Swiss-Prot record:
UniProt pathway annotation: Cofactor biosynthesis; molybdopterin biosynthesis
Root EC class: lyase
Matching InterPro entries: Aldolase_TIM, Elp3/MiaA/NifB-like_rSAM, MoaA, MoaA_NifB_PqqE_Fe-S-bd_CS, MoaA_twitch, MoCo_biosynth_MoaA/MoaC, rSAM
Swiss-Prot/TrEMBL keywords: 4Fe-4S, GTP-binding, Iron, Iron-sulfur, Lyase, Metal-binding, Molybdenum cofactor biosynthesis, Nucleotide-binding, S-adenosyl-L-methionine
Chain residues that bind [4Fe-4S] cluster 1: 23, 27, 30
Subunit structure of this chain's protein: Monomer and homodimer.
Domain Radical SAM core span(s) in chain numbering: 7-232
Binding locations of GTP: 16, 66, 97, 158, 260-262
Purpose of the protein: Catalyzes the cyclization of GTP to (8S)-3',8-cyclo-7,8-dihydroguanosine 5'-triphosphate.
Cofactor note as given: Binds 2 [4Fe-4S] clusters. Binds 1 [4Fe-4S] cluster coordinated with 3 cysteines and an exchangeable S-adenosyl-L-methionine and 1 [4Fe-4S] cluster coordinated with 3 cysteines and the GTP-derived substrate.
Protein name: GTP 3',8-cyclase
A GO BP entry: Mo-molybdopterin cofactor biosynthetic process
GO molecular-function terms, A-Z: 4 iron, 4 sulfur cluster binding; cyclic pyranopterin monophosphate synthase activity; GTP 3',8'-cyclase activity; GTP binding; metal ion binding; S-adenosyl-L-methionine binding
Length: 327
């Protein structure tokens, strides 16, 4: 089997596919200026195009697909997309990242269609603080989706919280206590600077090392990562059912274990979340007979993947916000 690899000896088995660039939340760290979309932008990838895309990437060794947004539940055909992706031979895991606003009543259908992992964005366990961060009053709906996911016993259930120095770090102990009796993983993501959130970043950035130092002192132990795992380092504790984790893009050598590629909701391959430029794959997603051309295009494009991002130098590439690419 072909395994995608770049010039930096990194293998890629994980694809993040954005299903839409539209989001119905207005998180300060992501869309501080609101969402400004080009009305003339191309249409979203269709279900047949998505199927051709996944089949092509599986032929290149991809084993895990994460469906992101924007907010992917805004797609009315989401269940059909999950079913199509899960049906491709070679796919070991189908994951979904969602803000959970309209997820609870769709979870059973998504699980039946083949969803094996859910990552729910939840930046606070307090309704008022949640609204202050996200601009949404749907806290109860998100919590209901989380409890439903626990009840359905999804194989992998994770909560993502962007680490914010003044807005949720003071409630860190609440998150830790939340996993004591719940079989979920809560991962804190270091706030990343984009072209739109400079002031917010300056106010709210906090290094993830602050958390890991506390956890290690409290007896939490690091867990070995799977080869298709995302960038999080997770920790377990004998007194807790759940896990804690940190995604620290500002840490040294963060990019040396990169194992994922991104495709936008319009069919463009993006080599790095904080890179520049995209490579349009859509012309090779129209018919199965184009498979060899698609594979060749992906392999050639991978030659342009750099060794790492330049976030530490305050260089966000051309990324205005994270909603466009799904983070």
């Amino acid at each position: 089997m072909i395994v995608l690899a770049d010039h930096h000896d990194r293998q890629f088995r994980y694809l993040r596919l954005s299903l839409t660039d539209v989001c119905n939340f207005r998180c300060g760290y992501c869309l501080p200026k609101g969402q400004q979309l080009d009305p003339q932008r191309p249409a979203l990838l269709t279900l047949p195009e998505i199927r051709h895309l996944i089949e092509g990437f599986v032929a290149l060794g991809i084993e895990k697909v994460r469906l992101t947004g924007g907010e992917p539940t805004l797609r009315s055909d989401l269940v059909d997309i999950v079913r199509a992706v899960a049906a491709v031979p070679g796919i070991r895991r189908v994951a979904l990242t969602s803000n959970g606003w309209n997820l609870r009543d769709r979870l059973a259908d998504l699980q039946a269609a083949g969803l094996t992992q859910l990552n729910l964005s939840l930046d606070s366990l307090d309704a008022a603080r949640f609204q202050a961060i996200t601009g949404s009053s749907r806290f109860e709906a998100v919590m209901a989706a989380l409890e439903q996911a626990i009840a359905l016993r999804l194989p992998i259930l994770k909560v993502n919280a962007v680490l914010l120095k003044t807005l949720n770090y003071p409630q860190l102990s609440d998150f830790v206590e939340f996993v004591r009796d719940r079989p979920i993983s809560i991962r804190f993501i270091e706030l990343m600077q984009t072209l739109d959130n400079h002031d917010y970043f300056q106010q709210e950035f906090l290094s993830g090392s602050v958390l890991t130092e506390q956890w290690l002192a409290q007896g939490w132990q690091p867990i070995k990562r799977d080869r298709t795992a995302g960038p999080a380092q997770e920790y377990c504790h004998p007194n807790y059912q759940g896990k804690l984790g940190i995604i620290a893009p500002y840490s040294p050598n963060f990019c040396q274990n990169c194992n994922r590629l991104r495709v936008t909701s319009r069919g463009a391959l993006r080599l790095c979340l904080f890179g520049t430029g995209e490579f349009d794959l859509r012309p090779w997603l129209q018919h199965p007979d184009q498979r060899s051309q698609l594979l060749e295009q992906v392999q050639q494009t991978l030659n342009f993947k750099t060794a790492g991002h330049q976030l530490a130098e305050a260089n966000s590439g051309d990324t205005r916000n994270l909603a466009t690419y799904g983070g």
